[in-house]
């Protein structure tokens, strides 16, 4: 009699069941991005326009929330001063895991034209940023595209990073 060997793992070594759960969790996380907005300057107007009926972020599953405790996405737009840095960090720390950040506009990305002692030269000096949107001010379509790119990034991530594949032999 021939013995059949059954391989219950996929290419990355995780069991098939965990890989399926991984895909399901990533799909659900990517299609329900609830963002807390932190608009500080002109880019906030474009961010508000993106949430309006003309651009309709709801069809991507993205809703703007007022509380960071209900959000998994933070969108920062405008010039961040050193006084604001503490509040940005506090809002980021209040968000539940997993969390993502979009930096919108030249001022949030690099400090923009405000190279002064009171300006933070890029929000990535305070919190980790996943996607940078260039421009002054970026169009609402750019923010929509950034959310779509973030959704693709989330789908590729490992939903359960703390699980390590076990060797059976």
Curated annotation (Swiss-Prot):
GO biological process, one term: aerobic respiration
Transmembrane segments: none
One GO CC annotation: plasma membrane
Topological relation to the membrane, as annotated: Peripheral membrane protein
Top EC group: translocase
Domain of life, source organism: Bacteria
Cofactor: [4Fe-4S] cluster
Family of this protein: Belongs to the complex I 20 kDa subunit family.
Functional description taken from the UniProt entry: NDH-1 shuttles electrons from NADH, via FMN and iron-sulfur (Fe-S) centers, to quinones in the respiratory chain. The immediate electron acceptor for the enzyme in this species is believed to be ubiquinone. Couples the redox reaction to proton translocation (for every two electrons transferred, four hydrogen ions are translocated across the cytoplasmic membrane), and thus conserves the redox energy in a proton gradient.
Protein name: NADH-quinone oxidoreductase subunit B
Protein source organism: Helicobacter hepaticus (strain ATCC 51449 / 3B1)
């Amino acid at each position: 009699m021939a013995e059949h060997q059954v391989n219950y793992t996929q290419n990355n070594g995780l069991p098939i069941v965990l890989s399926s759960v991984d895909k399901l969790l990533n799909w659900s996380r990517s299609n329900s991005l609830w963002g807390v907005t932190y608009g500080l300057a002109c880019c906030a107007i474009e961010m508000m326009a993106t949430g309006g009926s003309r651009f309709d972020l709801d069809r991507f599953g993205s809703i703007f929330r007022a509380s960071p405790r209900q959000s998994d996405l933070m969108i920062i737009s405008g010039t961040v001063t050193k006084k604001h840095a503490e509040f940005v960090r506090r809002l980021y720390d209040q968000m539940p895991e997993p969390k993502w950040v979009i930096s919108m506009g030249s001022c949030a990305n690099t400090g923009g034209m405000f190279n002064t002692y009171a300006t933070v030269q890029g929000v990535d000096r305070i919190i980790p940023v996943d996607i940078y949107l260039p421009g002054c001010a970026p169009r609402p379509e750019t923010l929509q595209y950034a959310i779509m790119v973030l959704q693709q990034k989330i789908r590729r991530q490992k939903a359960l990073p703390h699980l390590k594949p076990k060797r059976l032999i």
